[in-house]
Amino acid sequence: MLKLRALAEAKAKAKEGQGQETTPQVIKPSLIRLKKDLENIDLSEQICEYTTYLDENPMRVNLAIKPDIGYYAGGTYYFNVFIKDTYPMEPPVVKCMHRIYHPNIDIDGNVCLNLLREDWTPALDIQSIIIGILFLFHEPNGRDPLNKDAAKTLIEDPLRFENKVNHSLRGNNIDGVWYDKIIY
């Protein structure tokens, strides 16, 4: 008994010498998955760059998307990707940080991309989202719009749509709405 008491006292003294014991920090599964997704991004910096804010809640990834073809080529478009603790079971929320004239992005920055809604599965990742956004810039979808006026113009008169995109990317007013200057 005396040996046990002596051991307990020695342990207590050793603990006091170390200061307070810290509790181990639990790493969220969503953070582990997000870090893995980011490590696996295999895209050129000429097309996409990103910065992360993993200590925020929800976690955030800022994307700089640079389409190289299509109506929107030549611009850099910034998006915030908000990742909740339920990731990858639920998709991230993606917001465009610019007001742009696009059938699949409304003036509030909401993005209409099927893989962020009904087509989402846990097998998809951040690179899938980046590729999806790039595809929207390469091939805007007039059949599933958030900006119905832009979609109608795209479908009925693609040349007029192109002119409106070019005009809007220079920070001009289209149909009573001012757009952010993307191309200088």
UniProtKB/Swiss-Prot annotation:
InterPro entries: Ub_conjugating_enzyme, UBQ-conjugat_E2_core, UBQ-conjugating_AS, UBQ-conjugating_enzyme/RWD. One of its GO terms (molecular function) is ATP binding. Gene3D superfamilies: Ubiquitin Conjugating Enzyme. It catalyses: [E1 NEDD8-activating enzyme]-S-[NEDD8 protein]-yl-L-cysteine + [E2 NEDD8-conjugating enzyme]-L-cysteine = [E1 NEDD8-activating enzyme]-L-cysteine + [E2 NEDD8-conjugating enzyme]-S-[NEDD8-protein]-yl-L-cysteine. Residues 29-174 form the UBC core domain. Keywords: ATP-binding, Nucleotide-binding, Transferase, Ubl conjugation pathway. It comes from the Eukaryota. GO terms for biological process: protein neddylation. Pathway: Protein modification; protein neddylation. Belongs to the ubiquitin-conjugating enzyme family. UBC12 subfamily. PANTHER family: UBIQUITIN-CONJUGATING ENZYME E2 (PTHR24067). This is NEDD8-conjugating enzyme UBC12. The lineage of its organism: Eukaryota, Fungi, Dikarya, Ascomycota, Saccharomycotina.
